[in-house]
Amino acid sequence: MARKCEITGKKTMFGNNVPRKGLAKKKGGAGQHIGVKTKRTFKVNLINKKFFIPNLGRSVSIKVSANALRSISKIGLDAFLKKNCKKIENFL
């Protein structure tokens, strides 16, 4: 299964490791020198979480990012799904 949040759609991003050495010019140095850039991945912080749906009377297991889980705990699952244009039936 893909490493992707089922609600927000967040997934692995790609970028570079950029090693820097030297003192910055604004700190009185000769400037920072950048070495060889190497590829890297930024992985999503995913959690398999069970949510209880009271109007259906059952639990649903959803792979959700930590950021989305924080928002769900603040405003509730129904409101968060409505905000992200998702329906609970998609996760059954």
From Swiss-Prot:
InterPro entries (UniProt xref): Ribosomal_bL28 (IPR026569), Ribosomal_bL28/bL31-like_sf (IPR034704), Ribosomal_bL28_bact-type (IPR001383), Ribosomal_bL28_sf (IPR037147)
Disulfide bond annotation, renumbered to this chain: none
GO cellular component terms given for this protein: ribonucleoprotein complex; ribosome
GO molecular function: structural constituent of ribosome
GO biological process: translation
UniProtKB keywords: Ribonucleoprotein, Ribosomal protein
Highest taxon in the source lineage: Bacteria
NCBIfam families in the cross-refs: L28
Family: Belongs to the bacterial ribosomal protein bL28 family.
Name under which the protein is recorded: Large ribosomal subunit protein bL28
